[in-house]
Amino acid sequence: MSQIVTIFQNIRETETPFHRSVKCVLDRIKSGSSKELVQRIRKETDKANRNELKKELPAVCFSGQFNKRNDSAIIEHSGFICLDFDGYATKKEMKAERDRLTKDRYVYAVFTSPSGNGLKALVRVPEEPDNHTNYFNALEKHFNSENFDKTCKNISRVCYESYDPLIFINESSELWTSVVERDYVEVEVKRDAPTIPITDDNKVVEILVKWWTKKYGMVEGERNA
């Protein structure tokens, strides 16, 4: 297990990666390498301003080593998947979720998000880029939380560096190996029958007469008028 992840200076930077151990990144979160900025974010009451401030934080791709910040630029999977839990109505609910996550045998780490209103959880998975999304789908079912963010499944998903001196780490966490592949519903496309050109003049007239009669009716003697 490589346990090497990728850090970009911020979310705007996509092509200058730094590769560090996951331990290094979690140590930064615990010690507060971005403490001052995170505290500003948590004090900011305007959501738009918070989002702008977050763009200045280091951006971490926990799931591997990347040349650039996109899925196709992966060099090697780290053996980690980062999950988001957010949208809690109260701090009490968030604390209850955190307690539940720290007791889960598959959870490697849990820490508070930069906003202070959500949680990030790291889970160890096999180093299989092609199965990354399937592990994500299985973990969604496993945690069965209404606060689970379903949009964070792509392998190069960014996690902003946070600050949490009480970060939970369990280096003996178990490896998650179950996968769930989403069912694809085959949609039957009804196609019109191919049109066969009619070249016989009499046949054309016959078809037109039938159509006219059905639509408008015909008085005796009109056909040859």
List the model feature ranges, each with a label:
Residues 1-79:
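DNA replication initiation on ssDNA origins
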Residues 63-65, 114-116, 155:
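Short, glycine/charge-rich beta-strand/loop segments that flank catalytic centers
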Residues 5, 31-39, 43, 72-103, ...:
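Modules that initiate DNA replication and primer synthesis
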Residues 2-13, 17-20, 28-33, 143-193:
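Catalytic "initiation/cleavage/transfer" segments centered on a nucleophilic residue
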